[in-house]
Regions:
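Bacterial N-terminal signal peptides
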Residues: 1-9
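A beta-strand edge to alpha-helix "cap/lid" segment located at domain peripheries
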Residues: 13-46, 53-149
């Protein structure tokens, strides 16, 4: 009987833990977008694990936190990089040990040269739990989906 109770309770605890982790990484997304809109390359870089890999669209992978920091310093210094709004719609979220994996669709709007530009895409992100209990980006890959004309 005790074994049955244990087996019945463990999945519930795992779901609660997954929900708690989802809340934590959702807050990290919020911090990330805020840092990008402030053009704060250091704050963006701090959201990445030391051994992270960034896989930007149509570019070579950026490997390691130092290289990712340099990537973001160049990105936010570009005058074409402007503030944006972004809405993420998670379509899968799984936790395995100290890794949380999420796929999502995103929709956003930015204004450049007085023209409003809408964009849509998808991403795959793996978050890694740090020794201090926080979650940082371990792998990140995204792509925009061209609008249908």
């Amino acid at each position: 009987m005790l074994t049955f109770l244990f087996l019945a309770v463990v999945p519930v605890l795992a779901k609660d833990n997954e929900a708690t982790i989802k809340v934590a990484v959702t807050e990290r997304y919020r911090q990330w977008i805020a840092a990008e809109n402030k053009k704060d390359a250091e704050a963006i870089t701090d959201l990445y694990d030391e051994n992270a890999v960034l896989m930007p669209k149509q570019e070579e992978p950026v490997i390691g936190k130092a290289a990712i920091g340099e990537y973001y310093r160049k990105l936010v210094a570009d005058p074409h990089f402007v503030r944006f709004t972004l809405t993420l719609q998670s379509n899968s979220f799984h936790v395995v040990g100290d890794i949380a994996i999420e796929t999502a669709d995103f929709d956003g709007v930015l204004t450049r040269n007085d023209k409003q530009i809408h964009f849509h895409g998808k991403n795959l992100i793996a978050w890694k739990k740090q020794k201090d209990g926080s979650w940082k980006i371990f792998r990140y890959m995204f792509d925009e989906i061209p609008s249908k004309k």
